């Protein structure tokens, strides 16, 4: 009896153990499968997210460009008489262009090119526009600036004036006379070339280095005998005083304008510089095709009659162009002339500071 009972219990125990082992193996396999499936799914999700992020990064490079201008302050120097930058300031062209990138714009007004480039040398502004002579004086003084584009302007847009009743009838008659001119300005070169044409040594005149407002007062008060000046001050003086034009720059000086930038700005923020030039080009194209509108805009800014300003606008040209070998060569000739007559202390190489961007 007992042996049979033990055999029955033994068989029963074996079945229980066998059942447990079978169930344990199934549980173990199922558990492994579950963890494997979860791991595979997590891997796929992570991979998909990584691919999506990489795709977005590649598809939106402008976001990176925007980040490069974030917090940048673009400081513009301008003259009221410099049509394009004055119009851009009034219309907030640059503020609108930089809004999405997070950059901001500030403006500083100057009476002429030389003090503007002095401010650039001092680190107060990043970008500006002048006639052909100021950057030469600035380079000779060690100013780290860069030519970034040029504007054709016009030789008709600058001249040497004499009072309508003056005894001066020719360029040779300027010998010994007192001539008002903004030192280092575009008309400084016109004066040099005009004297050369008239056979007069630069040392044989009495230059009165005056900014346009002071020069106008001196001219009207007969405190100077002649005045080398550019538009629109030229057109305004002709209309108000009946002054005679002794000569304009035709055949004497190209009278180009130059867009200039601080070298540090060019090196650190080339994308911001390109945005500035793009907006300058758009406003320049508008000015070229709308001289009457430009005159109406400038009139209250300058306190000059719109009709007078329209005369000035119609005898000049507009554009924003990269410097060519021809333009660089002409600018070098001006620099060499200034060095020859000791207006600048050392010779300079224009091509060394021309932007290649």
Could you tell me what each predicted segment is?
Residues 9-36:
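Bacterial N-terminal signal peptides that target proteins for export
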Residues 45-48:
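C-terminal motif of bacterial Sec signal peptides marking the signal peptidase cleavage site
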Residues 50-52:
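Bacterial signal peptide processing site
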Residues 60-200, 208-209, 225-231, 253:
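Short, glycine-/small- and polar/acidic-enriched structural segments
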Residues 85, 154-160, 243-244, 255-259, ...:
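Small-molecule pocket liners
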Residues 133, 207-298:
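Pocket-lining segment of extracytoplasmic ligand-binding domains
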Residues 267-343:
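Secondary-structure end/capping motifs
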Residues 336-357:
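Conserved C-terminal helix/tail region of periplasmic/extracytoplasmic solute-binding proteins
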């Amino acid at each position: 009896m007992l042996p049979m009972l033990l055999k029955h219990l033994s068989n029963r125990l074996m079945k229980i153990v066998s059942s447990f082992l079978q169930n344990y193996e199934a549980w173990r396999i199922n558990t492994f499968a579950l963890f494997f499936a979860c791991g595979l799914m997590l891997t796929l999700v992570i991979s998909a997210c990584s691919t999506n992020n990489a795709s977005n990064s590649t598809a939106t490079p402008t976001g990176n460009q925007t980040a490069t201008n974030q917090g940048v302050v673009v400081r513009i120097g301008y003259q009221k008489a410099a049509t394009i930058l004055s119009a851009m300031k009034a219309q907030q062209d640059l503020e609108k262009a930089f809004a999405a990138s997070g950059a901001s714009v500030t403006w500083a007004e100057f009476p002429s090119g030389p003090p503007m480039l002095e401010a650039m040398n001092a680190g107060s502004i990043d970008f500006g526009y002048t006639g052909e002579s100021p950057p030469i004086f600035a380079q000779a003084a060690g100013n780290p600036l860069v030519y970034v584009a040029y504007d054709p302007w016009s030789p008709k847009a600058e001249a040497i004036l004499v009072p309508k009743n003056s005894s001066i009838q020719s360029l040779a008659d300027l010998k010994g006379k007192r001539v008002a001119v903004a030192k280092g300005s575009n008309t400084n070169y016109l004066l040099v070339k005009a004297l050369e044409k008239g056979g007069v040594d630069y040392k044989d005149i009495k230059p009165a280095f005056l900014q346009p407002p002071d020069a106008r007062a001196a001219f009207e008060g007969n405190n100077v005998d002649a005045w080398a000046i550019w538009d629109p001050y030229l057109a305004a003086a002709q209309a108000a005083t009946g002054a005679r034009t002794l000569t304009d720059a035709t055949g004497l000086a190209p009278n180009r304008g130059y867009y200039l930038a601080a070298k540090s700005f060019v090196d650190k923020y080339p994308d911001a510089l390109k945005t500035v030039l793009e907006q300058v080009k758009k406003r320049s194209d508008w000015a070229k095709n709308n001289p009457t509108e430009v005159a109406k805009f400038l009139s209250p800014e300058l306190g000059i009659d719109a009709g007078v300003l329209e005369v000035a606008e119609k005898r000049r040209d507009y554009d924003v162009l990269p410097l060519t070998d021809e333009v660089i060569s002409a600018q070098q000739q001006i620099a060499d002339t200034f060095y020859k007559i000791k207006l600048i202390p050392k010779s300079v190489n224009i091509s060394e500071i021309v932007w290649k961007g």
